[in-house]
Amino acid sequence: MAPNLVLGPLGPSRRFAGLGAVSIRCGWVNRRIVESCSAMALGPGSLAAVARRSTFVNLARNALRPSYLPVMLRKIKARLRPPNKDEALAWASEHAESVEIFGDSLDPALWAESNHWADEFEPQAQSILSTIGVPLGGGGHHRLLYFLTRLTSPGTVLETGVAAGWSSAAVLTALAANGSGSLWSSDFPYFRLENPERYVGCVVPDALRDGWNLYLKGDRSNLAEILPRCGQISLFHYDSDKSYDGRTFAMDAVATHLTPECVIVCDDIDDNTWFRDWVLKRGGAYRVFERGGKYVGLVGL
């Protein structure tokens, strides 16, 4: 029988299905997380107090978890290996184009809808993150992902890397507007935090969580479980292990599961030259967009 995982003081649990999928049936973010944080603001178990605990203590505690240690070691090794970042940054900057012009040229009404959604969603998400008080990194290009999901009406979307859930919220909202499609997400919680599973997807609205297929063991374990189940993938968003080897592994793993028309979005392509090398080797069109000093690569449109 699949075990239950109770995520700390926020109360409702996530039920593990199979070997790592999380069937998210109980909403615990947005209004409820804000209420919980307010009620516990002064208590010893508050999220603010959790955030102040030693990073090293949390690293050690999570390293003792058998399913965490191998992934942690791979991530630490990748960060210690200096990437060819300057070369990648120069290439991305040289090839960048305006995402506004791109979106408006394909479908002005849908691009306007995407911007309207993002303008409403961003302050709500920021409010949740401010209340939590835990650094969860930046999100993907959620405006672009909403737009692409609405534009292409994918049957199956795969994303690697969830964190707070900016991109997940964009895709799930757009799929709901489309009236069909499913999202399969692979993540590995921030191991510097205590009980890090509680924060994964924390900005995703409660109403969008039913049927969200979320796996939390890292890409190498998650993709082995997701790919036989999800069907052919029409939209793939890569935003997890940014190392050269990590990107190579993921693309090799999903290659035979992508539809011929699959749209591929890769975040942080300026971290190393993987995206440049990949698109030049495969041939065909590609696009590069700048966002907040970082760069996103797109293939398929």
Model-derived features with residue positions:
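Prokaryotic Sec-type signal peptides and long signal-anchor helices
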Residues: 20-23, 60, 106, 125, ...
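Intrinsically disordered, low-complexity segments enriched in serine/proline and basic residues
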Residues: 3-6, 12-14, 19
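Membrane-proximal basic amphipathic "stem/tether" segments
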Residues: 23, 27-115
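Intrinsic disorder/low-complexity signature
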Residues: 1, 21, 27-30, 55, ...
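Class I SAM-dependent transferase core
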Residues: 105-139, 150-151
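Alpha-helix boundary/capping residues
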Residues: 95-99, 105, 115, 121, ...
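S-adenosylmethionine/decaboxylated-SAM
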Residues: 43, 131, 135-301
